[in-house]
Amino acid sequence: ADYIIAHNEKMKKWLEDNGCKAKLGVLGIFDYLSETSAAPKQNTEKPYSVLYAGALSPRKNAFLYEVGAFVHSFSLNLYGNGFEINQAKGKEHFNYMGFVKSDDLIATAQGDFGLVWDGTSVSTCTGDFGEYLQYNNPHKTSLYIRCQLPVIIWNKAALADFVRENGIGICVDSLEELEKILNTLSEEEYAEMKKRTAKIGERLSQGYFVRKALQ
């Protein structure tokens, strides 16, 4: 190939370190084209709620069955197939919304943050799916941003830098920290994050990042 677009700087470095000689560009984040727009939301009040969309089975994301033990004041809204709620710790903190198509989710998402996490553990992202977060750009991150949801993401994920630099969410080492972090986040800080997220969401809807990578 004459030119390869890596998902992000971490993936670009991995390709270079592993012998890729092609010219490399960087995408930054996946655009997310959809005719649907996020519904305007009233002012957010505490306690915050966290949305997770994706595979919900214990095999793919066992962390979902452990995280409830560390939740006290906020709630988790789960979208997807295969959640076995009776196996989950702290199941009273979960709202299982079932499967919703992405375009519909943009317009109807219930939550204040979108969670990007994978694997078996709440204390770090483990296993093949979890470790891959160090190199890839999960589509769900872009989906959350189109829903105008600031992102909660693993600190070592490749996209954590993008989240930090753009002020569109929170980077955490462990989900065990989430209760304390959400309790101390002011409504003004959240409103600023949400405003920045909406701005990036606008870019995602226009194919901004692909166009930039091709320049």
Name each model-derived stretch.
Residues A1-L24, T36, A157, D161-F162:
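A short, active-site helix/loop in glycosyltransferases that binds the activated sugar's phosphate group
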Residues D2-Y3, F113, P150, I168:
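Well-ordered beta-strand positions
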Residues A6, I153-W154, V172:
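Short beta-strand scaffold positions
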Residues K10, I29-F30:
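Carbohydrate-associated surface elements
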Residues F30-A107:
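Conserved catalytic-core segment of nucleotide-activated headgroup transferases in glycan assembly
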Residues A107-C147, I153-D161:
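Nucleotide-sugar-dependent
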Residues D173-E176, K180, E187-Q215:
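A charged, aromatic-enriched C-terminal amphipathic alpha-helix characteristic of glycosyltransferases
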